[in-house]
Every structure is written in C-alpha cells, then in structure tokens.
Swiss-Prot record:
UniProt keywords, alphabetically: ATP-binding, Cell inner membrane, Cell membrane, Cytoplasm, Membrane, Metal-binding, Nucleotide-binding, Protein transport, Translocase, Translocation, Transport, Zinc
GO biological process: intracellular protein transmembrane transport; protein import; protein targeting; protein transport by the Sec complex
HAMAP family (alphabetical): SecA
Gene transcribed to yield this protein: secA
Organism encoding this protein: Helicobacter pylori (strain Shi470)
An example molecular function term from Gene Ontology annotations: ATP binding
UniProt name for this protein: Protein translocase subunit SecA
CDD domains attached to this UniProt entry: DEXDc_SecA (cd17928), SF2_C_secA (cd18803)
Length: 865
C-alpha cells in the first residue's frame, strides 16, 4: 500500500527508466531530417563510418563507444527500415531497442512489433564485429524473422544466417555462424555449444564467441524451459523386461492402500502394504536391498507413469512412440525424452516399443548457457510476474514499455461454476452467441484432452471451429492467423502460436474485436496473460474472460477453502456462477503459490547445476588448450609421467626407495610392464641408483624412441588427439557418476545433512579423482603407443586421416532433455586403452578381445598389446 502511494508521488523505477529513455528518443528524432536527405549510398557510408569508429577502439572500450554512437545508429537503422521494409520505428520501439542494448528485458505487448525492435539493438551491437545471436522459440519464427529482416541488415552491410534443425551439414553450420547476425532456436544454439566441446579441431567449432544475444519470448525460454537441460547422451545397458514387469506391478497396486499421491509436489509414496505386494510380485525378499536397486527404481517410475502422467495431457502416442506435450505451450516436444527411465516407463504403460535408457555425454541448462554471454537481453509480452526470478537468476531487469496506442481490451472478472460440466455448458452458450453475431472467438484450454472435449461439444452443437493443439502443430501459424476472421471459432492449447499476429478487419473491430475465453486458469499468471494478450493488439478493441470450476486442477489442489465456502453459502443452483473480484484475487493467490513452487524448483536445479558448471567450464577450458596447436602437449605428457611415478612410489611401503625388498621390486617390475609397457629386468632395478631417476629415464627414452619416426606436426597431432580422447572418455564417466550422485543425494536429508552441501563436497572430491584419473590414463596410454614399422611414419598418418574422416561422418542425434543417440566413442580405436577380455576388440572385427587381438596381437599398428 505504502509502496503504491510513493509510486504515485515520485513514480516507479520503471517510470524513471522510461523518462531517461525518452530523452534519448528526442536526440534520435532530431537526426531524422538529416538522414532523410541522404541518398542510399550516403546513408550506407554513414553507417560504415560507425563500424570503423567502434572497431578502432580497444575491446574493453567498445561498449562505451556503442552508447556514444547509439543515436546515429538507431536513426540510420530507422531510416533504412523506412526505405527497405516500408516500416518506421515508433518512439516506443526506439525505447525497446535501448532497453535491449542495456542488457535488460523489454516487456512489450502483443502486436507492438518486437521483431522490428530487435533490429535496432542487433544493428548497433554488430558494429563491434562479433556475431549477434537472435534466439527464438521455434524454427518457423527463426526462419520467418530472419527472412523478413534480412533486406534491412543487408542494406546496412551485415550478413545474416539462420540455424534450424534442418541444417545437418557441419560446413554449412560453420558458414552460418560466420555471419554477422545469426537467428536460431534456443535448442540449436545450446546443442551447438555442446557439440563444439566435442570437436577435435578449433577450426571446426562454430560458436567463436558469446558476445550478445537477444532472446525472443524470453519468459518461455529462460523460465518455462529452465528445468529441462540440454543433454547429449548414449545408450546404457539395461534389461528391457524390467520395465514391463514394473508396469504390471504398478498397475496391480491400489491408491491409498499400496501407495499415496501428493499432487502438489507430484510425488508418490509406497506404503508398507505396497512394498510387501511388490516384493511378492517381483519375487524378491527385500525390494530395497542393493542388488534390487534397479527394480525399486523401475517401480517408482512405473507408478509415476501410471498415476501422475496422463495421455493427451502430458504426452500423446503417435507412430508407436510416446511424445511429450510441452506443459506451457501445448506443442509436441519432438525428440525430447523424460529422464531417469520415466520415458521407458511410459512406453511400457502404453505398450509401445521401449527404447534404451541413456547415459549423459554432455549437458548444460539454459540458465548456464545464456549466462555465458557478455551481454544478454530479452523480449516478451509477459515478464513482470517473473521479474524477481529474471533478476535473481540472470541479473536481467524487466522494463515495461508503454504501448504505441492505448489498450482498449476489456478484461472481465472470472466466472466460477461448481462443476466442469456446468462450466463447459456456459462456454458453449457464449461461443454460440458470439458466433451467431459474427465476432471471432479464441478459446484457450489447458490440455489436449480438454480441447478435444470442447471440440466434441461444439461438433454436437454444429458450430464450425478449428482446433490447435499439439496434434495439429504443423498448421499452427496458419490457424492462428485466421483466428480473427468473421465468425471464426478457434480452440488453442495454452496459447500455442505465440509470435503470430491475429489481425482484424474494420468490420471485426466494429463487432467488438477478438473475444478471448479461457476455460481454465493456468498454474502461471503469465500464461493466462499471454492468452489475454492475443486480443487488443495495437489499440484494437477486444474482450477476455475466464470460465472456471471448482473441479479445475488449480482450484482443487491449490485453491483456498474461502472460494468453496463462498459457493456453499450462496447456495448456487445448477448452472449458476459467481463473479467477484474477491474470488478472482483468491485464484491469483493460488497461482502465486504454484509460481513460487516452480521458482524454488528452478533455483534448486540451478544450485546443483552450478556445481557441475564450474567443473564443465574447467574441463572445456583445458580442452580448448589441447586443441590449440601452440599448446606444449609434450610438456604436459612429461608432467603426467612424473605424477604417475610419484603415485607409484608413494604406495610402496619403504619411502627409502634404495632399500626396497625383492618382493616390492618384483611388484614394481610388474607395474611398469602392465601399466607402462616398460620391460625392466629385476637386476637392473636392484642396481639402479636412484631408482626413481632410472625409471623416469627409461619411460622417457622408450617413448621418445617410438616418436622418432614422426615429424613435429604429426607428433603434436597424435598427442593432442589421444589426450583429447582420454579427457572426453573420463569426462563422460564423470558425468555418469555425477548423475548417480545427484539421484541419491536427497536421502542425506534423512540423516540431518544438507543434500546440497553434501553434493558440493562429494562432487569436488569426484572432480579431483577425475583429474588424477586423466593424468594416470594419459601416461599409461602414451606408454603403450606402438608402430608396426618403427622406420615408417605412414602408419601414424593413416590413422590421423582415418580419425578425421570417421569423426566427420559420425551420425549423432542431439535432443532436448534426455536424448538417445549413437554411442559417441570416437572410432580411433588405435589409441584406446587395453580392453577387458570380454569387451569388443578395438580392431573392429566384431569379435570379443579375448578371441581376437589378445591372441594374435593387434591388427592395427598404433594399438599396443
């Protein structure tokens, strides 16, 4: 209350920002007459001068210079837009551009021209000479926006590229990323970053810098998708029959007897009776013994699949596959899979083919990917409800931009009914009334199931209509565009189709504009605001109203008893509703509860991922050093050799190495032979003084003798590639260990320990072990490198060529969240460590190692026995 009064007197922080930006708008507008008089060539030359000015200063002074040239850059960009696109930036759009350049989020209502606004900040920041990324939510918008704005950018002397899922060729991707301005989806940018850190050449990395990114629909990408990391993964060996058996057991269990459901937290707790039943059906005496850990895990996931996840709401079944439905957009999430075996549990539930579980090979959250950028900005129509999260997680402030024309849309109070049937009956009556009048109506639903219920009711009443949900996602843009036609009735799930304007004719405006009906409040107020925002664009008339029932999930799970109490006191008859600001406010309070739960969940995820992120950055930095041809890899190998020997001697009983017993010397001899391929006689060890110097020289001379056949470039390439393989394999194993650690860490809470603190401690220790393992594995592998002909380097060159060729033709699938793809083990088998007897032979024969090269020696020269 006090805050509101102070805001009215001195203005809010947002008001003060807008006031400052308006002063700069005056400066930009003052330049317009000057640039209007220029020819195209003169205008382009003026912009080229700005490029020279910005690029001539030191890098750390470029941001300051950008602010100095901002008025000229914005004025030239606007003039160019007038000539090329036939569109002039409004003053409020200039403000939006300045907000983006300041690294903030511009909240602009639907229809205010966010795509055009972005050109101002993009053109300005591209002056520095580093690629600017424009991030969108789907391939359609990335392609549309880049093609629409490309003529403007070309006029200003910029090149433009678009990254979509259809761009498969690595060289083509490399070419696109070399452009001044790159449009693409958040998934493509994120996966390209992960792919870059699996490349074996710096020249093949596509993302050269992370200077500036503008994220369109920033709330969808940085908030809604923050809980689902990008993961590249490979298959894990699991027994597929366990999924089906667990599904049978789960289906036989009864709610409230064998298990209880916590709908608020979406968890299931098995009772003692349930445990006994499961043990009986699985045929085990104790479900929670260590050897039965896989069974108990499968059962947990099967229970979730059967009782917390629902077809046509959380997923659909299409083409013998379970496909996730995005809870926020209603779109199908093609290629995305639930993690930790949940997706396999859903496949067992629905009786479709079960795909293998997968192991993480590389991963990152959107939070940590986008926080890498030196400057980050965003645009959306709905951000203020999440302003705290944007500031706390991303250090992004939200600035609400005034509309160019006043909003005329009427937002009516919610209507609340006792039952869902009564609610839908009322919705159908309202739709019929509007349709008969010719006024277009857009109906928002919370799930595919509800949209199809409404579809059936409208069909029964013979009211023509169009349905847009995940099953019709390919026609999304076309359906949304036509939603403003006379008499149009459009049903849309969770307001998919963002980014597509619904334009109205004068006749429709006379009828009252687009009428929005929400059939259920979403868990997030922001999603509801997005639905409302489809109406009333650019000063158009319109109306919005939500129809609710006490049976809706939000009110049933989170709604206060006050709403139910009011309904009971009023003694409403069938079909009657209540409409009051008090009830609407109570509904919004319920939404705030859920929003806070989701915020805490995302923050919790980030706290854990921040631990892994520091390790990821460290590993990727070292990886880049190895890729650098100027890095002294030979010195690193020598350092590892010294470390390995220190480790060996530290484990021997007598630290006085000259007084080792014969038994210890024999053990040392065997270690040198097995681990380092060094053949040393027992008598030589007895005579050596000091022994550590003798061994160090022996290992070094053996290695140098093998490497003599290579020229310096060949040697450097081989050493770097082998070391990279060792690093990559160790990192993947580390990620697997970290996944397992994270899965069980919450159990520490029962022991009065903070799981996050425990996770930090243990992950740090695991990281130290990772570093040690890499050093030891590196020196062991390098010690075993051999050539068939020690006088000929062609063997090494052949393997380098094969390596490059096989890497180039790897077929790998990258997916959002949990992805299944071909195993990423690099085909340069010659450099692999000695396999175990039952592992596949690295020569590629397809036989087990014990039946192949273990008997006859390696078929390929670089692999040592």
């Amino acid at each position: 209350m006090i805050k509101a009064i102070i805001g009215k007197i001195i203005g809010t922080r947002n008001d003060r920002w807008i006031k400052q930006y308006k002063k700069k708008v005056l400066a930009i507008n003052a330049l317009e007459p000057t640039y209007e008089k220029m020819s195209d060539d003169e205008l382009q030359n003026a912009f080229e001068e700005l490029k020279k000015r910005v690029r001539s200063v030191e890098k750390d002074l470029q941001e300051k210079t950008l602010l100095e040239v901002l008025p000229e850059s914005f004025a030239i960009t606007r003039e160019a837009s007038k000539r090329i696109l036939k569109m002039r930036h409004f003053d409020v759009q200039l403000i939006g551009g300045m907000v983006l350049n300041d690294g903030k989020i511009a909240e602009m209502k639907t229809g205010e021209g966010k795509t055009l606004v972005a050109t101002l900040a993009v053109a300005l920041n591209a002056l520095k000479g580093e690629s600017v990324y424009v991030v969108t939510v789907n391939d359609y918008l990335a392609h549309r926006d880049s093609k629409e704005m490309e003529p403007l950018y070309h006029f200003l002397g910029y090149s433009v590229g678009t990254i979509t899922a259809s761009v498969r060729d690595d060289d083509e991707r490399l070419e696109i990323y070399s452009k001044d301005i790159v449009y693409g989806t958040n998934n493509e940018f994120g996966f390209d970053y992960l792919r870059d850190n699996m490349k074996y050449s710096l020249e093949h990395k596509v993302q050269k810098s992370h200077a500036f990114a503008i994220v369109d629909e920033v709330d969808s990408i940085l908030i809604d998708e923050a809980r689902t990391p990008l993961i590249i993964s490979g298959p894990v060996d699991r027994r597929m029959e366990n999924y089906n058996k667990a599904d049978e057991v789960a289906k036989s269990m009864q709610v409230e007897i064998d298990f209880t459901i916590d709908e608020k937290n979406r968890t299931i707790l098995i009772t003692e009776e349930g445990i006994k039943k499961a043990e009986n059906l699985f045929g085990v005496d104790n479900l929670y013994k260590i050897e039965n850990a896989a069974l108990s895990h499968h059962l947990d996931q099967a229970l979730k699949a059967n009782y917390l996840f629902f077809i046509d709401k959380d997923y659909i079944v299409a083409n013998n596959e379970v496909v996730i439905v995005d809870e926020f957009t209603g779109r199908l999430s093609e290629g995305r899979r639930f993690s930790e075996g949940l997706h396999q549990a859903l496949e067992a539930k629905e009786g479709v083919s079960i795909k293998e579980e997968s192991q993480t090979l590389a991963d990152i959250t959107f939070q940590n990917y986008f926080r890498m950028f030196s400057k980050l900005a965003g645009m959306t129509g709905t951000a203020q409800t999440e302003a705290t999260e944007f500031l706390e997680i991303y250090n992004l402030e939200v600035v609400s931009i005034p509309t160019n024309l006043a909003i005329k849309r009427k937002d009516l109070n919610d209507l609340i009914y006792k039952s869902e049937k009564e609610k839908f009956d009322a919705v159908i009556l309202k739709i019929k009334e509007l349709h008969d009048k010719g006024q277009p109506v857009l109906v928002g639903t919370a799930s595919i199931e509800k949209s199809e219920t409404l579809h059936a009711l409208l069909k029964k009443e013979r009211i023509p209509h169009t349905v847009l949900n995940a099953k019709q996602h390919t026609k999304e843009a076309e359906i949304i565009k036509d939603a403003g036609l006379k008499g149009a009735v459009t049903i849309a799930t969770n307001m998919a189709g963002r980014g597509v304007d619904i334009k109205l004719t004068d006749e429709i405006k006379e009828l009252g504009g687009l009428y929005i009906i929400g059939t259920e409040r979403h868990e997030s107020r922001r999603i509801d605001n997005q639905l409302r925002g489809r109406s009333g664009r650019q000063g158009d008339p319109g109306t919005s109203q939500f129809y609710l029932s006490l049976e809706d999930n939000l009110l049933r799970i989170f709604g206060s008893d006050r709403i139910k109490g009011v309904m009971e006191k009023l003694g409403l008859k069938d079909g009657e509703h209540i409409e009051s600001k008090l009830v609407t406010r109570a509904v919004e309070n319920a939404q705030k509860k859920v929003e806070n739960l989701h915020f805490e969940s995302r923050k919790h995820l980030l706290e854990y991922d921040d631990v892994a992120n520091e390790q990821r950055k460290s590993v990727y930095k070292f990886r880049d050093e190895l890729l650098d041809v100027n890095y002294d890899i030979s010195a690193k190998i020598a350092e590892n050799r010294e470390y390995a020997l220190n480790q060996i001697f530290s484990k021997l009983k007598a630290f006085d190495h000259q007084n080792l017993s014969e038994e210890e010397l024999l053990g040392l001899k065997n270690i040198l032979k097995e681990d380092f391929n060094a053949h040393v006689g027992l008598e030589d060890l007895k005579k050596a003084s000091p022994i550590e110097n003798f061994i160090a020289e022996k290992l070094k001379s053996d290695y140098e003798n093998k490497m003599k056949v290579l020229d310096s470039e060949q040697r450097s390439r081989i050493e770097r590639i082998v070391y990279l393989q060792i690093l990559d394999n160790a990192w993947r194993e580390h990620l697997y260990t970290m996944d397992n650690l994270k899965t069980g860490i919450n159990l520490r809470g029962y022991n009065q320990k903070d799981p996050l603190v425990e996770y930090k401690k243990e992950s740090y220790n695991l990281f130290l072990e990772l570093i040690e393992d890499i050093k030891m594995e590196a020196i062991k592998t390098f010690s075993k490198i051999q050539f068939e002909d020690e006088q000929d380097s062609s063997d090494a060159e052949r393997y380098l060529d094969n390596f490059s060729e096989e890497r180039e033709h790897e077929s790998v699938t990258y997916r959002h969240e949990e992805a299944l793809d071909e195993d990423l083990n690099v085909a340069m088998k010659a450099f692999a460590k000695t396999p175990k007897r039952n592992e596949p032979c690295p020569c590629g024969s397809g036989k087990k190692y014990k039946d192949c090269c273990a008997k006859s020696g390696p078929k390929k020269g670089l692999f040592a026995k």
